[in-house]
């Protein structure tokens, strides 16, 4: 049986002006257009592995080109257009992949990339959804360990600001609200490290740098700020957490510890107005 969204190994049954007809063991045929066979020498009787999809006229056709994902897989794809019924994303073939409006769990933007799961809808057409959570795997025991560096892509932001992320594009992970500081949006790629592994196998990730590295970077940031502003800044260890996060993108606790370290090194002093460079 020839199925949309999958690879099939088919035999070339005949050549026509506009392409080749391929058939399976049951005699079912599908067209391989000339445009989808460019660069390949093909003759009758050849066995070809082709991807099956529907063209703009809704006809089932095949191609030797490799799509970015097949049915049942998750891919990181770019949105190429959006209208009042849905969006279209590039999955590597001539025809773009449709994402119905009801399958968009957040607003998609043209030119941005997001994670999508591809499926076949009730009309036997290819479609995609941003609702990928149930299709992500749980990492097997031992695949990741605490402190491992990982690549993550955000696919959901919860009301408490916890981020659901896909680790390496296929495993379930999360980043708690206190483990990230910057504004993060769906589809964003993040580099982090494993902080813990939950009982259900979900990977807990942090974007925080290791303490010494983070404090060293923050010290440099504070000193540069002071040098660029005449040796003074209107922030000290009494400043509000909101002001500190807005200006230095860090927590008040880290800010206070870093100021304390700079004072011990006799590089700065604090007063009620702020902090001064020595």
Regions found by a protein language model. Give the residues of each.
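Single-stranded RNA-binding regions, centering on S1/OB-family and related RNA-binding modules
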Residues: 1-278
């Amino acid at each position: 049986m020839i199925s949309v969204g999958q690879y099939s190994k088919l035999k070339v049954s005949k050549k026509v002006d506009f392409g080749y007809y391929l058939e399976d063991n049951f005699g079912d045929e599908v067209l391989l257009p000339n445009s989808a066979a460019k660069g390949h020498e093909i003759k009758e009787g050849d066995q070809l592995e082709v991807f099956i999809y529907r063209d703009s006229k809704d006809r089932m056709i095949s191609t030797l080109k490799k799509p970015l994902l097949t049915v049942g897989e998750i891919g990181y794809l770019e949105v190429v257009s959006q209208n009042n019924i849905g969006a279209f994303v590039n999955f590597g073939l001539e025809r773009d992949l449709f994402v119905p409006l009801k399958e968009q769990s957040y607003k998609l933007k043209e030119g941005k990339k997001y994670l999508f799961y591809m499926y076949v809808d009730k009309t036997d057409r290819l479609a995609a959804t941003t609702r990928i959570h149930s299709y992500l795997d749980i990492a097997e025991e031992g695949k990741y360990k605490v402190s491992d560096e990982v690549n993550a892509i955000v696919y959901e932001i919860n009301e408490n600001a916890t981020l659901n992320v896909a680790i390496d594009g296929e495993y379930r992970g999360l980043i708690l609200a206190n483990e990230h500081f910057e504004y993060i949006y769906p589809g964003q790629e993040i580099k982090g490290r494993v902080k813990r592994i939950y009982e259900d196998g979900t990977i807990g990730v942090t974007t925080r740098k290791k303490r010494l590295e983070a404090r060293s970077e923050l010290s440099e940031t504070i000193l540069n700020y002071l040098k660029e502003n005449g040796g003074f800044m209107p922030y000290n260890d009494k400043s509000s957490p909101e002001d500190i996060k807005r200006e230095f993108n860090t927590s008040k606790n880290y800010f206070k510890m870093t100021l304390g370290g700079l004072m011990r090194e006799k590089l700065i002093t604090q007063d009620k107005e702020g902090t001064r460079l020595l």
